[in-house]
Amino acid sequence: MVGIWRGEGISSGHPLDGVLENLNWFGKRFHADFRADALLFQWQPGRLVPIEPSVFPIRLVLRFASFGRTFIARNWFSYLERAFRAKGPTATVKLRSVDFNETAAMVYDRQPIVDYFRRIDDNEVAGMMVVKGDDRCYFFRLHRVDNAGW
């Protein structure tokens, strides 16, 4: 999975449906040392910015997710993105068991979040974000992109 992957939410009735896309979420970046940039946003055309997930208390985000789909949220986020920038990778990729199957998982460093991945083909992965203590899952798709452009 090493490289840059473009993300796309899959509508499922989860509170975060449409939130990441509204805030110009690009996807995720996986490094060869099993570390990852969990939240990668497009700041300007041709410029990707890794965001530190721990600046957003996940329970508060889930409670007020509808605000994240507004024009105001998009504007605020675009101005505050620089302050939210990660200083380095924010998650670790490991093997984890889901429904008795071993699968790749991205464990966030300072959030109770794990993203589980299933390979669709060489260039596409299905993802499921799980927040500890919350029965709802956020589903997304990742498409491999050419690193040369970034």
Residue ranges of model-derived segments:
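Soluble ligand-binding/transfer domains with enclosed cavities or grooves
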Residues: M1-W150
